[in-house]
Amino acid sequence: MRVERVLLKDYTTLGVGGPAELWTVETREELKRATEAPYRVLGNGSNLLVLDEGVPERVIRLAGEFQTYDLKGWVGAGTLLPLLVQEAARAGLSGLEGLLGIPAQVGGAVKMNAGTRFGEMADALEAVEVFHDGAFHVYCPEELGFGYRKSHLPPGGIVTRVRLKLKERPKEEILRRMAEVDRARKGQPKRKSAGCAFKNPPGQSAGRLIDERGLKGLRVGDAMISLEHGNFIVNLGQARAKDVLELVRRVQEELPLELEWEVWP
């Protein structure tokens, strides 16, 4: 187990966030010790806005045994989702193609039920192991209340590993599906971002609504509504959380959109 003081901007895909005490745990016993005081769990740092003042709680990051995986067995929650998508395709296993390009770890993808219009994380789950109240518990997906970009984990629960529901398919078929998903994602920005900023209202596209209001290019400090896709806020270099929040406020003044990101603290 490694404990260090860090700036969370170096651990988030948006490149924003203040100081915290980072606990990197590699075993189940280390996880038990790390959770003996108030904590938060950090995955790959996407879909997350950390305030400039940082967080007072321990920030736990899963490594070691939590990054091991068996596509036909248990997959550690610290495993990168893009890696799994590619490995499944190489093995001729279908079920993850719709998650192509999502820069999350498995645990974070489960917690927020990450997905695209081609599929979501809950679709690929057979079982989920969650650590809470000092013990490890296994749940079937139906017990975790998955919905659009959300789940209902037990309070303080940490996803530790999952079993995937994959089916054998011809590799050519899987690759065609992945190419279709990849084409649909081509309009997304290359600059630092936390992923889609706002949830899509039922039957509508948040990005299109933002575009129609002429909000693309709206900027506060180094935080800007992407010119490439209206539902992305990008960091032009030195953006701070306060800049991002002000940009969110201005969008929400114009449109009744719900923020998709988690905000710390």
Curated annotation (Swiss-Prot):
Gene3D superfamilies cross-referenced by the UniProt entry: 3.30.465.10, UDP-N-acetylenolpyruvoylglucosamine reductase, C-terminal domain, Uridine Diphospho-n-acetylenolpyruvylglucosamine Reductase, domain 2
Alphabetized GO MF terms: FAD binding; UDP-N-acetylmuramate dehydrogenase activity
Catalytic residues (UniProt): 149, 196
Segment forming the signal sequence: none
A GO term from the CC aspect: cytosol
Cofactor: FAD
Keyword Cell cycle: yes
UniProt keyword list: Cell cycle, Cell division, Cell shape, Cell wall biogenesis/degradation, Cytoplasm, FAD, Flavoprotein, NADP, Oxidoreductase, Peptidoglycan synthesis
Domain FAD-binding PCMH-type as annotated: residue spans: 15-169
Annotated Pfam families: FAD_binding_4 (PF01565), MurB_C (PF02873)
Metabolic or biological pathway: Cell wall biogenesis; peptidoglycan biosynthesis
InterPro entries noted in UniProt: FAD-bd_PCMH (IPR016166), FAD-bd_PCMH-like_sf (IPR036318), FAD-bd_PCMH_sub1 (IPR016167), FAD-bd_PCMH_sub2 (IPR016169), MurB (IPR003170), MurB_C (IPR011601), MurB_C_sf (IPR036635), Oxid_FAD_bind_N (IPR006094)
Reaction(s) catalysed by this chain's protein: UDP-N-acetyl-alpha-D-muramate + NADP(+) = UDP-N-acetyl-3-O-(1-carboxyvinyl)-alpha-D-glucosamine + NADPH + H(+)
Biological processes annotated in GO: cell division; cell wall organization; peptidoglycan biosynthetic process; regulation of cell shape
Enzyme Commission code: 1.3.1.98
Enzyme class: oxidoreductase
Subcellular location: Cytoplasm
Family, similarity comment: Belongs to the MurB family.
Classification via PANTHER family: UDP-N-ACETYLENOLPYRUVOYLGLUCOSAMINE REDUCTASE
Function: Cell wall formation.
Full protein name: UDP-N-acetylenolpyruvoylglucosamine reductase
Gene designation per UniProt: murB
